[in-house]
């Protein structure tokens, strides 16, 4: 059942922030001394036209999230490219509902296809 407070994503913006760590962090054979943070701003609108915005941020810790023989730069670039693709997909996502429902629908319906498409033909 829809409610007047249901929201739909109207806009999504992505910012990459370079951050140097205070101390080196070791992940297996690799050492992290800096990281790129992906910061996102999402704007939503409810059925009455009221708007709200929210922010989220996560570090793209290449060595931690993607241990591989590929170079750091190849993995870092791919993570940033996928973040840009996700941001575009969120901006076009037209599902309406409670924010948790909207997010869950994106995870279940959009993300698997986006991930498969992005990974098609990529090296491990």
Regions found by a protein language model. Give the residues of each.
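Short, Gly/Pro- and small/polar-rich lid/capping loops
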Residues: 1-41
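Short beta-strand elements
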Residues: 36-46, 56-58
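Generic signature of intrinsically disordered, low-complexity, basic-rich segments
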Residues: 8, 52-54
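Metal- or metallocofactor-binding catalytic centers and their adjacent structured scaffolds
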Residues: 54-124
């Amino acid at each position: 059942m829809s409610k007047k407070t249901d929201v739909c994503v109207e806009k999504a913006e992505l910012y990459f922030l370079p951050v140097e760590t205070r101390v080196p962090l070791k992940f297996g054979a690799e050492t992290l001394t800096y990281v790129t943070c992906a910061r996102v701003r999402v704007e939503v609108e409810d059925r009455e036209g009221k708007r709200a915005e929210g922010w989220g941020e996560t570090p793209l810790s290449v060595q931690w999230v993607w241990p591989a023989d590929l170079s750091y730069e190849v993995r870092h670039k791919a993570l940033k490219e996928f973040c840009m693709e996700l941001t575009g997909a969120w901006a076009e996502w037209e599902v309406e509902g409670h924010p948790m429902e909207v997010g869950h629908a994106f995870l279940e319906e959009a993300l698997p296809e986006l991930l498969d498409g992005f990974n098609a033909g990529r090296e491990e």
